[in-house]
Amino acid sequence: MSPFTDPSRTDSGTDPALDGPDESLRRSLGVGRRRFLSTCTAVAAGAVAAPVFGASPALAQDRGRDHGHGHGHDHDHGHGRGQVLVPADRRGIILYTVRDATARDPLASDLPSGFREVFKQLARHGYRQVEFAGYNQHANAPGGASLESVQGARLLRSWLDDYGLRAQGNHGFIPSSWPLTAEDKETFKKHLEIANILGMDHMGTGSDPTGSSYRADWDVAADKWNELGRIAHREGIKLYTHNHDGAYGFLLDGGPLDDQGRPTRSSGIRKLEYFLKVTDPRVVWLEMDIFWAHVAQYKFHTYTAHDGSTRKKVFDPAGLVVRNNKRYPLFHAKDGVVSTTNGQGYDMVPFGTGVIDYRTFFSRVGDRNYHNPMIEDDNSPSATDPAQSLREAKISYDNLAALRKRC
């Protein structure tokens, strides 16, 4: 597998092989591929250190910024110290965080339920962007149980537009087959069509490219993602993968072989670092889950080198983004408190109530008008407190909005 030599390149290029069938019309109009289809549809329808034990308390909530449907006045036009780190139009949430609300029966509860009511509530909180985690909701909600269709996407788009929200991505269908079966390829294209109707710039998955630790398997994953990325690129969509902690562990790429002929030692490169090197930067993108990246920082700080020596290498999530900034258009922004018992270093909590230093992370990463942080908290839904997830979504929004640049 030959590495791509320009991992920072972000231009789409003019390679005819990457062009779609509507290029002549699109170019005559002077608009991008994604915006072309999206507009037609609308008209028709952390830090460097290991876990920060004893870190600063939670950010104070700033609740004076919400007006109407979240169109707050953040006065974030300043420069340097004190600058808002995440502009209002970049503040998003993955709907997995409030999955209990979208799945709630509107006939059995007065709380917001189904996509339409949840969109309304999130807009009131101040959010401007959402990332989908599939298109299913309760069957009694407007539109029915599944909106995973062209018609369903048009309905979702109308609700997003009603509440001033923008769809920025989806954790959805990535074919399991490789080489791609005809059926998987058609299903993938259907999801790209849905993404375009919804106005998304990005489409991806909540899973790692592979769960393997071996270079050969990551080479196969890179081939697959390069092909899927080219298909998505032709439809004007940036295809992205999402990480958990294991993907930032060390790649096994040398040393003695085990009894199955597989390498047992590492050169010190992390799996997703290698993936960045061997995927095409024009067509494959990443969403860093900052919580899981910090778990990886806690768990994977030594490796056995090819010569058998033990070497230390602390993971720097922000540093990796800085070196590959345009490859990371999306983040999952979720927080954690220190745990000494769960083996991960952190327990998830609402954003801004934990110890992960997001002020430093976003200050180092910069490019605030490019990155799209999506609030996520796996633990927000509660079996005993049905209002909790949307309530915590508000807490998380306020803390994200309160972040100011560190010099």
Model-derived features: positions:
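Active-site acidic/histidine proton-transfer and metal-coordination neighborhood
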Residues: 41-42, 51, 175-285, 295
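Acidic/histidine-rich catalytic cores of soluble enzymes
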Residues: 232-350, 355
